[in-house]
């Protein structure tokens, strides 16, 4: 269950890049995100509402420059929206709880799903399984 936060207060605490990504559907520069090379065991949450989205076991190195996962934590974690921006069709992924922009999903990922959830670090908050440390993206 998502930790209930005051949305206005939480959005006011976002950095410029976090706000650009989550609220304005922006994209951080490739290979720039804090969580790209994170190898720790834990849960990746939505930065805005702390809804659990992905677990470290589904993370893989796709070489694309953004954290990549082959599946979300559960079906309700993610909302899918057809995106026709930039003269192409993609599938945008948003937080299923607060609607924050996360990134896009592509059908070029590894098994068992064949999907690649390409997620901006700036939209995530990582919680370490060992010590509970939180690392905002």
UniProtKB/Swiss-Prot annotation:
Biological process (GO), any one: protein repair
Q: Which NCBIfam families match?
A: peptide-methionine (R)-S-oxide reductase MsrB
| Keywords for the protein's UniProt record, in alphabetical order | Metal-binding, Oxidoreductase, Zinc
Q: Which reaction is recorded as catalysed by this protein?
A: L-methionyl-[protein] + [thioredoxin]-disulfide + H2O = L-methionyl-(R)-S-oxide-[protein] + [thioredoxin]-dithiol
**Taxonomic superkingdom:** Bacteria
Q: Could you read off the lineage of the organism from its UniProt record?
A: Bacteria, Pseudomonadati, Pseudomonadota, Gammaproteobacteria, Enterobacterales
Identify the residues that the record assigns to the MsrB domain, covering every copy. Answer: 7-129
Q: Which residues bind Zn(2+)?
A: 46, 49, 95, 98
Q: Which residues catalyse the reaction?
A: 118 (nucleophile)
InterPro entries, alphabetically? Met_Sox_Rdtase_MsrB, Met_Sox_Rdtase_MsrB_dom, Mss4-like_sf
* Single GO cellular component term: cytoplasm
Cofactor(s) the record lists: Zn(2+)
The family this protein is said to belong to = Belongs to the MsrB Met sulfoxide reductase family.
Q: How is the cofactor bound?
A: Binds 1 zinc ion per subunit. The zinc ion is important for the structural integrity of the protein.
**What organism is recorded for this protein?**
Yersinia enterocolitica serotype O:8 / biotype 1B (strain NCTC 13174 / 8081)
Q: Which Gene3D superfamilies match?
A: Peptide methionine sulfoxide reductase (2.170.150.20)
Q: EC annotation?
A: 1.8.4.12
Q: What is this protein called?
A: Peptide methionine sulfoxide reductase MsrB
Gene Ontology MF annotations: peptide-methionine (R)-S-oxide reductase activity; zinc ion binding
